């Protein structure tokens, strides 16, 4: 995918999320500590942004930078859990998995 198309897609995601939150460009600019002109350019896909501005925008919109860049939704709770699992031994991970499977069974889900 070329850069211009990526920027346009990212801009579309920013605009959709902003509107979904009921924010104006001005309100998003204030919330993200960026200028209204910057938000406008970002939404139009006319400009890329530095990583620190991408992070500000994502935080203000309550989404991950991955979502803005690619459209992939990463639930922050799942990401946090994943980081915690990385600190466990393989045996401990299997134990956590069995506990999760039991919870799924108890609450009507399928045993994965």
Model segments located where?
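Interfacial/linker helices and their anchor residues that mediate assembly or domain coupling
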Residues: 74-112
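Recognition helix of helix-turn-helix/homeodomain-like DNA-binding domains
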Residues: 33-48, 70
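Short amphipathic helical patch at the helix-1/turn junction of helix-turn-helix
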Residues: 8, 19-20, 48
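Short basic helix-loop element that most often maps to the first helix and adjoining turn
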Residues: 12-29, 56, 89-92
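DNA major-groove recognition helix of helix-turn-helix/homeodomain DNA-binding modules
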Residues: 52-67
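A detector for short, charged/polar N-terminal pre-domain segments
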Residues: 1-9
């Amino acid at each position: 995918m070329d850069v211009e198309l990526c920027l346009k897609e990212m801009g579309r995601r920013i605009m959709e999320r902003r509107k979904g939150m009921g924010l104006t460009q001005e309100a998003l600019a204030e919330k993200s500590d960026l200028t209204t002109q910057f938000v406008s350019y970002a939404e139009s896909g006319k400009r890329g942004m530095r990583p620190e501005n991408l992070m500000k925008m994502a935080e203000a919109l309550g989404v991950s930078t991955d979502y803005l860049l690619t459209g992939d939704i990463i639930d922050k709770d799942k990401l946090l859990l994943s980081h915690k699992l990385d600190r466990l031994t393989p045996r401990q991970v299997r134990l956590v998995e069995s506990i999760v499977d039991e919870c799924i069974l108890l609450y009507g889900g399928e045993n994965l």
